[in-house]
Regions:
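Positively charged n-region of N-terminal signal peptides that target proteins for export
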Residues: 1-4
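Cyclophilin-like peptidyl-prolyl cis-trans isomerases
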Residues: 18-193
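Bacterial N-terminal signal peptides
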Residues: 6-17
Length: 193
């Protein structure tokens, strides 16, 4: 029995680094009308943003929201409006962590916001091309940029399919997919997912 403790310790020590790594890089699945998108988040470089995003995922907030802004050769945006173009009530804004070193490259996910740098709440966008002009440059109103907090690791073909949809205007919104694309389900990947 006294040999069991060292063996168990060795076996468990092999599990700890992978558990910690998964903790720093949780994966979120979006099941959409066009297919699945899996996003790996970077909790180490964007801790407050990831915590904010996961709070929306865990609460079921994103389910039933649509990708309401789609611009070919730029990005797809979602996470705040229902299918009838109604804004959902959000939590308080999150501090802008765009100075974290992550870049707005194709396949990355970033927080959408107003002109106020620290105004991001639930809305996000996925870059469909490299958008360096959205990167952090300085802590000034014009230089803050948009906080990248993860990347698509599966389902970029779904992102591309959404990007290529015909768009129209609906009320005060332009670049809205003519056929709505909803997030049916959003969840954090677990060992059972």
């Amino acid at each position: 029995m006294r040999h069991f403790a060292p063996i168990a310790s060795i076996l468990l020590s092999g599990l700890v680094p992978s558990a910690l790594a998964a903790g720093d890089h949780p994966r979120v699945h979006f099941e959409t009308d066009k297919g699945e998108i899996v996003i790996e988040l970077d909790k180490a470089l964007a801790p407050k943003t990831v915590e904010n995003f996961l709070s929306y995922v865990d609460s079921g907030f994103y389910e039933g929201t649509i990708f309401h802004r789609v611009i070919k050769g730029f990005m797809i945006q979602g996470g705040g409006l229902t299918g009838n173009m109604q804004q959902k009530k959000t939590n308080a804004p999150v501090v802008n962590e765009a100075d974290n070193g992550l870049k707005n490259l194709r396949g990355t996910i970033a927080m959408a916001r107003t002109q106020e740098p620290n105004s991001a709440t639930s809305q996000f966008f996925i870059n469909t091309v490299d958008n360096q002009f959205l990167d952090f440059k300085s802590k000034t109103p014009g230089g803050w940029g948009y906080c990248v907090f993860g990347k698509v690791v599966e389902g970029m073909e779904t992102v591309d399919a959404i990007e290529n949809l015909p768009t129209t205007s609906k009320g005060m919104y332009s670049d809205v997919p003519a056929t709505p694309v909803a997030i049916r389900r959003a969840f954090v990947e677990t060992g059972d997912s």
